[in-house]
A protein has these predicted regions:
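Hydrophobic alpha-helical membrane-insertion segments
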Residues: 116-121, 267-281, 348-372, 451-455
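Interfacial loop-to-transmembrane junctions
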Residues: 419, 423-451
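Transmembrane-helix bundle segments that line or gate the permeation/cavity pathway
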Residues: 2-4, 14-251, 279-280
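Long, well-ordered mid-to-C-terminal structural blocks that present hydrophobic/aromatic surfaces
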Residues: 283-374
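Juxtamembrane boundary at the C-terminal end of a transmembrane helix
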Residues: 456-468
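Hydrophobic alpha-helical transmembrane segments and adjacent short intramembrane/lumenal linkers
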Residues: 348-356, 360-417, 426-427, 435
Length: 468
């Protein structure tokens, strides 16, 4: 086996830096063993929950909706973040045309999208601390004749709920996964500037609180990822009976134990996040390219794949939504006297993050080095502000046996543990709705089978050859 493992590191394809999400290597490990093992772990987790939770009073003692305080933005950090956004847009227009030397694409795709998401799952909703949108709202209100209410705008969103976030996140995913040059500094600067105008207009029309709560996709996204974090702000009453908050520790993913149900649009948003990161991996596989008549060994570039990838992105979301719907239908068929918990969608959030971590990890380890170098000379004027301009990017760890194995095991662990967490969360939520436990077992079987199947799919994505 060691000979097999040693052999594949010599045929690793060169890491492609044209897109922050590309995987740096193809793993040719004995995949049947690892895929089967990962699926077995998820299945055994479900059995364990039946044995332990079903025979105890845990169902009656599950605490939903922990007294969590929504993190409020820090004004000076918000203004600093907005200023940084304007500077980055300027860098996109005036800086180096090479995406790997321009701070805008590196900050957007590597530091913010990959890095901040990972940090949020550990430390909580950092985005709320640094979000530029509150500062943008205050800036708008300074203009004569404009009054921006934090609660109400000119119009009410009514029943739109999360649908604007769904549409905007789909456009963002299309830019990342389908657009021929998502890292082009000039293109990215224009798109971010347009999005800034859209956000400002929406806050003016609908009110900043209303828009940011359910419609601004990244505020929604980071809030959901923060539910995975063991760190949160806990509300507490002080001596004079006033509300206060303090940093507290909880079990990872316990923030997902919530009684309020997401509306259909909120469910669609979670499924969209999950389907986009899945299609990101699928779209580079030899299987997908061959399906579209493309020779994977002579990959012509993303331009010829714009239409197939657009259709594929939509189809992946449709498949995920259909699978989610059928899971509920089958669960109800198996036990018509007990409807499956509508909060099941919360259990899919760990899976979305697990795929995010596993999918982006190799590229992040390399591309973050480019970002650190670019920070020292953002305008390509020969500066060395932080002493990193002379650094050399190292990707040699992607061809070293020990480091490659470590990366692959981290990816496997992320996917398997994400599904384990999903099974536990789904079971606890269902058990809360049916504390007697036994009647809820049948309802959980379709969801567990879905997660086992998705575990197999995710590990296959990690192991199958891809075109870079």
């Amino acid at each position: 086996m060691k000979i097999l493992l040693s052999g594949f590191i010599f045929i690793l394809p060169e890491l492609a830096f044209a897109h922050a999400g590309q995987r740096g290597h193809v793993m040719l490990l004995p995949t049947n063993l690892y895929i089967g093992g990962g699926a077995a772990v998820v299945a055994l987790t479900f059995i364990f929950m039946i044995i332990v939770a079903g025979k105890s009073a845990i169902g009656k003692n599950i605490k939903l909706n922990q007294p969590e305080v929504q993190i409020k933005p820090v004004s000076w950090l918000s203004f600093l973040s907005l200023t940084a956004m304007f500077i980055l847009i300027l860098i996109g227009f005036k800086g180096n045309s090479d995406p790997m030397q321009n701070l805008l694409p590196l900050t957007t795709w590597v530091v913010w999208w990959i890095g901040l998401t990972m940090a949020t799952a550990i430390f909580g909703n950092l985005w709320n601390f640094i979000s530029p949108w509150p500062a943008l709202g205050k800036l708008i209100s300074f203009f004569p004749g404009i009054y921006l209410s934090s609660k109400l705008g000119v119009f009410s969103l009514g029943k739109l709920a999360y649908w604007p976030a769904v549409i905007l996140f789909f456009l963002y995913a299309w830019l990342e996964l389908v657009h021929p040059s998502p890292m082009d500094p000039d293109t990215l600067a224009r798109i971010i500037f347009i999005y800034l105008i859209i956000t400002a207009s929406a806050m003016l029309i609908f009110g900043s609180k209303q828009w940011l709560n359910t419609c601004e996709p990244f505020t929604v996204f980071f809030r959901m990822v923060a539910w995975l974090s063991p760190i949160y702000l806990k509300s507490a009453k002080v001596e004079n009976n006033t509300e206060s908050s303090r940093i507290s520790i909880r079990m990872p993913c316990s923030g997902l134990l919530r009684s309020e149900l997401l509306p259909l649009s909120g469910t669609a948003f979670v499924l969209l996040v999950l389907s986009t990161v899945s299609f990101d991996g699928l779209s580079r596989t030899f299987w997908w390219l061959s399906l579209n008549g493309i020779n994977p060994l002579e990959f012509p570039g993303k331009t010829v794949m714009v239409l197939p990838n657009t259709l594929g992105l939509c189809a992946t979301f449709f498949v995920f939504a259909t699978a989610y719907y059928l899971t509920h239908v089958i669960s109800y068929f198996l036990n018509p006297y007990l409807k499956p918990s509508g909060s099941f969608i919360y259990s899919l959030i760990p899976i979305a993050f697990g795929y995010h971590f596993a999918h982006y990890l190799p590229a992040f380890l390399v591309d973050i080095q480019y970002a650190l170098i670019a920070f020292s000379d953002p305008f390509s004027l020969g500066w060395n502000l932080f002493g990193t301009s002379g650094w050399t990017v190292s990707a040699s760890f992607l061809s070293h046996f020990d480091s490659v194995i470590m990366i692959w095991f981290l990816q496997i662990s992320a996917i398997v543990l994400a599904h384990v967490a999903a099974v536990i969360v789904a079971y606890l939520l269902q058990l809360h709705d049916s504390p007697n436990g036994q009647n809820s077992i049948l309802v959980q079987v379709p969801a567990t089978l879905l997660m086992i199947g998705y575990t197999i799919f995710g590990l296959w994505l990690l192991s199958t050859p891809v075109a870079v």
